[in-house]
């Protein structure tokens, strides 16, 4: 019973003394110890085994027990010492706390004494400085009074002097005095309630009014609205009067400027009246020459009279431009039928040159907000009549690289005078647009005539497959028209020009490209099987001649160039035209037209090679395959197909070297056309023996290898065929091989044969199965049981998908092919 109680006590003690791992780790860090008894994972059994490893060591058990007892007594002594030391800790803590509280109370008392002394010191300082503050206020008020009296004296004296000098027209002294009086008067705004101050202010306003009227009268006398200008240079009186006008109401200054400019341009209105011969567009140079002479005359006679900041030379030029625009608009409306395109362009050229002259000489600081709003913000200066660093040769080279008006340097600063006169020509730009319509029509006709005269590009030359030169000529002309028209207007005329561009892009596509594509002939339709099998290497089987193949490739390359450049043309037109009109620029229809030409060209190349291979496939289907006794080399029809591929494909590849993506498209289309046709003719080879099937399998493998190598066939540089093309060939020709493997398999037992068919052909349907049975030469009675077994072994297809798998793996329908072509063309457009 006692032993059980001791065990329970030990267990409870161990439970109480069980420490968490974190606490145990902290203890080990603070009190490191190597004693096994201090370890957290202490094991009494292991510890005893360590002390007594053998039975012989038990002889020393008394010594070990004595050592442990001695250690226990030592630990007990240490514990008692520590416990006794903790008995007085609470009392010592309370005593320390009381001492700290007393120290804090003493500190608060000292702080309160310091605060009281500071308040007493502040009160003493206020009493000492009270009298000094009153003296400061008195001094400040006295200073203000003296300053105000001085200002009042200055104002009164200044007003008297101002009135006297005004009567004597002493404008030089008035300019400085008036500014001083105005500055002094500002100090009295808060004293306007005082009658005397208000009276002085009214006298200043009256003097200003009198000065303004007097100065205007002096200018009217010097420069009368009617009559000739006063001879001689400007007087010092008027020069000083302008300085005074700078200080007066701005309306006085504007009135002086208006009257002077009106008088200065009065001669111009007389010389270039609507009924005068020099007023018409053919003599527009004389207008600009006249104003240039007037500007020189002004600088010599009146340059020093007006302050420089008035910019009188620029103001005269701007007013001249407004008057000229109005006069030209009026005369062109009256004589609209007499405007010819050469005359219009001549006038616009001279006008834009004059606007450029103004931009070089003046900053445009006098152009009012209304003027700036009225004149649309100009595009970058690309005036074709001004000096242009880009030569025509450079332009043509850039166009050959597919670049249209690519920016090569930072954008030039806008010309603030752009359109200030030339805007008047915009309503008459229909003459220019009609002229460009006529010129482009003649250009297209010339292209057609040149093509007929020079003929298609010659094979075996650098011309073969190259872009037609007429294409670059067309876009060079387009660029010149676009740049020129953007100088004339960036509004509706640009939209009209875009419509003209669209019209002749379509005509070029129809007349030059589509119109010159060779027509499919039927000359090879009379080839017989015997003649096909007897043909020698190098004989002509292709429907198109070498020249015609080169022509098709050249038209394809040209259409691709037109497609890319038309897209760039659309972007540049959107940059040139007003932002509000950009949505009306859309050349997608024209790009689709060129895409159609590309598709037609590729289709012709595919049809040509396809037609060349047709007789060989017909010969394959007519051969007596049931009589073949041994497997030899590839059959003659395979040799014929390979011969035609080796004849046509290298020519097409070399001529489409600059458009590899379309050569790849040609290869893909040919594979999609040839492989289904080959499988169709394969089903016609019936009946067929086992050896015949083996020969056909060998032929099929040979064709598969040739088709896989088709993109680089006959080329010195071997390139890996595109993955998309390889996938089509492998999928299609593997199906043909699987068909032949099924044909070669014995048809008994029936279950094994049917299962083998389902395993080899993924499109396992009854129609294909029956064709294979026909190839094996089985009778209809045998076929019916096998077909029934096939229907039983086939898994039920999902609703609505029956037959669809067959269609998807047989030749694609025209709709599917057309859809695929459209998707590919859209992808090409995006990448371009």
UniProtKB/Swiss-Prot annotation:
Gene3D superfamilies referenced in this protein's UniProt entry, alphabetically: Methyl-accepting chemotaxis protein, Vacuolar protein sorting-associated protein 53, C-terminus
In-chain residues carrying the UniProt-annotated modification Phosphoserine: 377, 580
Q: Does the keyword Phosphoprotein apply?
A: yes
N6-acetyllysine modifications at: 110, 360
In the record, Phosphothreonine modifications are located at 391
Q: Which Pfam families match?
A: VPS53_C, Vps53_N
Listed A to Z, the keywords are: Acetylation, Coiled coil, Endosome, Golgi apparatus, Membrane, Phosphoprotein, Protein transport, Transport
Gene Ontology CC annotations of this record: cytosol; EARP complex; endosome membrane; GARP complex; membrane; perinuclear region of cytoplasm; recycling endosome; trans-Golgi network
How is this protein situated with respect to the membrane?
Peripheral membrane protein
Q: Where is this region: Disordered?
A: 373-392, 794-816
Location in or out of the cell = Golgi apparatus, trans-Golgi network membrane; Endosome membrane; Recycling endosome
Q: Which GO terms describe its biological process?
A: endocytic recycling; lysosomal transport; protein targeting to lysosome; retrograde transport, endosome to Golgi; vesicle-mediated cholesterol transport
What InterPro entries does its record include?
A: Vps53, Vps53_C, Vps53_C_sf, Vps53_N
Coiled-coil ranges from the UniProt annotation: 55-142
Q: Oligomeric state and partners?
A: Component of the Golgi-associated retrograde protein (GARP) complex, also called VFT (VPS fifty-three) complex, composed of VPS51, VPS52, VPS53 and VPS54. Component of the endosome-associated retrograde protein (EARP) complex, composed of VPS51, VPS52, VPS53 and VPS50/Syndetin. EIPR1 interacts with both EARP and GARP complexes and mediates the recruitment of the GARP complex to the trans-Golgi network. Interacts with VPS50 in an EIPR1-independent manner.
User: What does this protein do, in the record's words?
Assistant: Acts as a component of the GARP complex that is involved in retrograde transport from early and late endosomes to the trans-Golgi network (TGN). The GARP complex is required for the maintenance of the cycling of mannose 6-phosphate receptors between the TGN and endosomes, this cycling is necessary for proper lysosomal sorting of acid hydrolases such as CTSD. Acts as a component of the EARP complex that is involved in endocytic recycling. The EARP complex associates with Rab4-positive endosomes and promotes recycling of internalized transferrin receptor (TFRC) to the plasma membrane.
The family assignment reads:
Belongs to the VPS53 family.
* Name of the protein this chain belongs to: Vacuolar protein sorting-associated protein 53 homolog
User: Which lineage is the organism of this entry classified under, starting from the top rank?
Assistant: Eukaryota, Metazoa, Chordata, Craniata, Vertebrata
């Amino acid at each position: 019973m006692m032993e059980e109680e001791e065990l329970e006590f030990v267990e409870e003690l161990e439970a109480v003394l069980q420490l968490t791992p974190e606490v145990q780790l902290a203890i080990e860090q603070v009190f490191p110890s190597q004693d096994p008894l201090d370890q957290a994972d202490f094991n009494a059994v292991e510890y005893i085994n360590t002390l007594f490893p053998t039975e012989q060591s038990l002889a020393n058990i008394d010594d070990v027990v004595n050592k442990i007892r001695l250690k226990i007594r030592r630990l007990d002594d240490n514990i008692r010492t520590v416990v006794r030391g903790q008995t007085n800790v609470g009392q010592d803590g309370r005593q320390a706390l009381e001492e700290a509280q007393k120290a804090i109370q003493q500190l608060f008392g000292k702080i309160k004494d310091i605060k009281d002394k500071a308040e007493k010191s502040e009160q003493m300082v206020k009493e000492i400085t009270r009298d000094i503050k009153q003296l400061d206020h008195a001094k400040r008020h006295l200073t203000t009074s003296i300053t105000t009296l001085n200002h009042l004296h200055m104002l009164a004296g200044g007003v008297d002097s101002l009135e006297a000098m005004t009567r004597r027209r002493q404008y030089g002294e008035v300019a400085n005095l008036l500014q001083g009086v105005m500055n002094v008067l500002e100090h009295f705004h808060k004293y306007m309630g005082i009658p005397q101050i208000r009276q002085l202010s009214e006298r200043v306003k009256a003097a200003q009014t009198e000065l303004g009227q007097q100065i205007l009268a002096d200018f009217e006398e010097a420069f009368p609205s009617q009559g000739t200008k006063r001879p001689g240079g400007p007087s010092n009186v008027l020069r000083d009067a302008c300085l005074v006008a700078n200080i007066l109401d701005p309306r006085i200054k504007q009135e002086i400027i208006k009257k002077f400019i009106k008088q200065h341009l009065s001669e111009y209105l007389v010389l270039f009246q609507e009924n005068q011969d020099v007023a018409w567009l053919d003599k527009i140079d004389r207008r600009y020459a006249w104003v240039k002479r007037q500007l020189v005359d002004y600088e010599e006679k009146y340059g020093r009279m007006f302050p420089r900041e008035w910019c009188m030379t620029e103001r005269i030029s701007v007013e001249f431009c407004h008057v000229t625009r109005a006069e030209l608009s009026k005369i062109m409306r009256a004589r609209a039928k007499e405007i010819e395109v050469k005359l219009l362009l001549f006038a616009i050229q001279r006008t834009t040159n004059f606007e450029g002259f103004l931009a070089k000489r003046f900053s445009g600081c006098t152009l009012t907000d209304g003027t700036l709003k009225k004149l649309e913000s100009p595009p970058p200066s690309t005036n074709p009549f001004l000096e242009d660093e880009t030569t025509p040769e450079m332009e043509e080279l850039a166009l050959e690289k597919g670049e249209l008006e690519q920016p090569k340097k930072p954008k030039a600063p806008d010309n603030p005078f752009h359109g200030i006169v030339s805007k008047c020509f915009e309503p008459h730009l229909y003459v220019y647009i009609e002229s460009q319509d006529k010129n482009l029509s003649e250009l297209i006709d010339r292209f057609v005539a040149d093509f007929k005269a020079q003929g298609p590009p010659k094979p075996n030359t650098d011309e073969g497959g190259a872009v037609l030169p007429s294409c670059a000529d067309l876009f060079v002309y387009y660029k010149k028209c676009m740049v020129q028209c953007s100088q004339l207007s960036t509004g509706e005329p640009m939209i009209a020009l875009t419509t003209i561009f669209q019209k002749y892009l379509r005509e070029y596509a129809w007349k030059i490209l589509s119109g010159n594509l060779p027509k499919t002939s039927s000359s090879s339709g009379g080839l017989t099987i015997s003649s096909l099998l007897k043909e020698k290497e190098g004989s002509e089987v292709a429907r198109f001649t070498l020249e015609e193949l080169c022509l098709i490739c050249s038209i394809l390359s040209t259409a691709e160039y037109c497609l890319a450049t038309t897209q760039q043309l659309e972007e540049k037109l959107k940059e040139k035209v007003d932002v509000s009109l950009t949505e009306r620029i859309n050349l997608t229809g024209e790009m689709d037209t060129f895409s159609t030409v590309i598709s037609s060209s590729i289709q012709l190349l595919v049809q040509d090679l396809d037609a060349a291979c047709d007789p060989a496939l017909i010969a394959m289907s007519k051969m007596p395959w049931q009589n073949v006794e041994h497997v030899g080399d590839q059959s003659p029809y395979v040799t014929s197909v390979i011969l035609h591929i080796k004849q046509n494909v290298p020519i097409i590849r070399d001529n489409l070297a600059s458009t590899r993506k379309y050569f790849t498209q040609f290869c893909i289309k040919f594979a999609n056309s040839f492989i289904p046709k080959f499988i169709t003719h394969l089903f016609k080879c019936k009946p067929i023996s086992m050896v015949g099937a083996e020969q056909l399998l060998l032929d099929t493998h040979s064709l598969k290898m040739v088709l896989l190598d088709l993109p680089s066939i006959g080329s010195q540089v071997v390139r890996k065929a595109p993955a998309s093309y390889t996938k089509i060939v492998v999928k299609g020709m593997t199906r043909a091989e699987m068909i032949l493997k099924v044909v070669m398999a014995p048809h008994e037992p029936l279950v094994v044969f049917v299962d083998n068919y389902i395993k080899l052909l993924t499109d396992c349907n009854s129609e294909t199965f029956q064709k294979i049975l026909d190839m094996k030469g089985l009778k209809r009675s045998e076929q019916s049981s096998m077909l029934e077994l096939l229907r039983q072994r086939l898994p039920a297809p999902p609703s609505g998908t029956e037959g669809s798998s067959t269609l998807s793996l047989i030749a694609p329908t025209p709709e599917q092919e057309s859809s695929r072509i459209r998707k590919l063309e859209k992808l090409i457009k995006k990448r371009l």
